[in-house]
UniProtKB/Swiss-Prot annotation:
It comes from Xanthomonas oryzae pv. oryzae (strain KACC10331 / KXO85). Its EC number is 1.7.1.13. Catalyzes the NADPH-dependent reduction of 7-cyano-7-deazaguanine (preQ0) to 7-aminomethyl-7-deazaguanine (preQ1). Homodimer. This is NADPH-dependent 7-cyano-7-deazaguanine reductase. Its main location: cytoplasm. Belongs to the GTP cyclohydrolase I family. QueF type 2 subfamily. Keywords: Cytoplasm, NADP, Oxidoreductase, Queuosine biosynthesis. PANTHER family: NADPH-DEPENDENT 7-CYANO-7-DEAZAGUANINE REDUCTASE. One of its GO terms (molecular function) is preQ1 synthase activity.
Amino acid sequence: MNTPEDSTLGREVAYPSGYDPSLLFPIPRAAGREAIGLTGALPFTGRDRWHAYELSWLDAHGKPCVATATLHVPHDSPALIESKSLKLYLNSLNATRFNSAEAVRTRIVTDLSTRAGADVSVEFGLPPIDGVGDGESIDALDVSIDDYGPPNAAYLTAQAQPVVEEVLTSALLKSNCPVTGQPDWASVTLHYRGAPIEREGLLRYLVSFRDHAEFHEQCVERIFHDVLLRCAPEWLVVEARYTRRGGLDINPLRSSLSVPAPLSVFRDLRQ
């Protein structure tokens, strides 16, 4: 079984000179989910949306082509794709000739689906940047914080008040790569219906990820799991928009609804 320590993270590697799908490094989701307490049927649906900013190949005549792309990896794929390996794989296309852009897209779909163990979708282009986004930010709350990890779900409570439907956001989520220790920065959105979540506690909880080491996808699943257990909303959608590294950013979304609530699809200003 592949582990994060087996990947190219934190290692000096040569950039590929030709197309090489073996560069893609899948990491089973099961171990990360077991650490959270997700051992049975998953309480969510969702996807990991990747934005690729550095995609290039050669056309049939050898002329370079450039593009951006949006990739969707389903939440129930047996494996996630380690980000540095995806960067190296996409770079392996740089000197490869294709007859059409569609041939490139099809090749990426096939390779990613094989490694993830589920159908991955790929489309050219990126969502628009939105400087406002959905919801109400909790970042201006006047709170004292001195707990930066590990994540502390005890901060999460729901108020004994009538049910609301609201979207709460924070740009203060930070976690760290579990292999290299590099910081991962994100804006996070919670859309839910239920008793009002106590906002100061939610902010303290999100900040308690600051020294925590876990992959992006696992952080979002941990947030979803903790909020669902501690606050018991009728339904919940959690999405994080991580900042770019190596020409890629990751945007995991988890929802308790079979069809996720209509959060807008956009890129954050920091992306």
